[in-house]
């Protein structure tokens, strides 16, 4: 995965999530003990190159293995021209705020914001048994 320290300025980590975000994740259907999450803030000109996450924090927090997790990406803002999220061979654009995308823990993925508006999303590492 990407270096946690290198991307700290662009994230709100699980241990610092506001109550409103925790409540929102609960509304999606995930109780606090089944996930680890962070808010991604991607400003214009920023990107997260192609990578696989190691889910290290989630594994440690929930005492589970890497293979036990799936990722859920929730877009918090509507898509703007110049923004893209990619997972394996698929590139996603034109999302609406609240749209969710689920992918396997081992999938390669990336994100780029070449537009003029900041992109906000929540990334959730959730135990597979809780995915409906």
Where on the chain are the PLM-derived regions?
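Short, flexible loop/turn elements at secondary-structure junctions
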Residues: 41-43, 54, 74-80, 105-107, ...
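Non-heme Fe(II)/2-oxoglutarate
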Residues: 1-38
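A short hydrophobic beta-strand segment most commonly corresponding to one strand
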Residues: 70-75, 100-102, 116-132
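Conserved short histidine dyad/triad with adjacent acidic residue
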Residues: 39-67
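Extracellular structured ligand-interaction cores
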Residues: 34-36, 45-47, 69-73, 80, ...
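Conserved metal-binding segment of the jelly-roll/cupin
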Residues: 93-109
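Short proline/glycine-enriched turn/loop segments at secondary-structure junctions
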Residues: 109-115
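A short beta-strand-loop-beta hairpin characteristic of the jelly-roll/cupin
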Residues: 69-96
């Amino acid at each position: 995965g990407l270096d946690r320290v290198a991307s700290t300025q662009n994230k709100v980590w699980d241990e610092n999530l506001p109550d409103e975000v925790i409540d929102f994740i609960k509304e999606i259907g995930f109780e606090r003990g089944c996930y680890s999450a962070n808010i991604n803030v991607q400003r214009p000109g920023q990107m997260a190159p192609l990578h696989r996450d190691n889910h290290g924090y989630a594994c440690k927090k929930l005492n589970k293995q890497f293979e036990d997790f799936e990722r859920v990406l929730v877009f918090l803002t509507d898509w703007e021209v110049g923004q893209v999220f990619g997972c394996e061979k698929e590139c996603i654009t034109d999302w609406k705020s609240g749209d969710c995308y689920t992918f396997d823990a081992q999938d390669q993925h990336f994100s780029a914001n070449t537009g003029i508006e900041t992109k906000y999303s929540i990334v959730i590492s959730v135990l597979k048994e809780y995915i409906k």
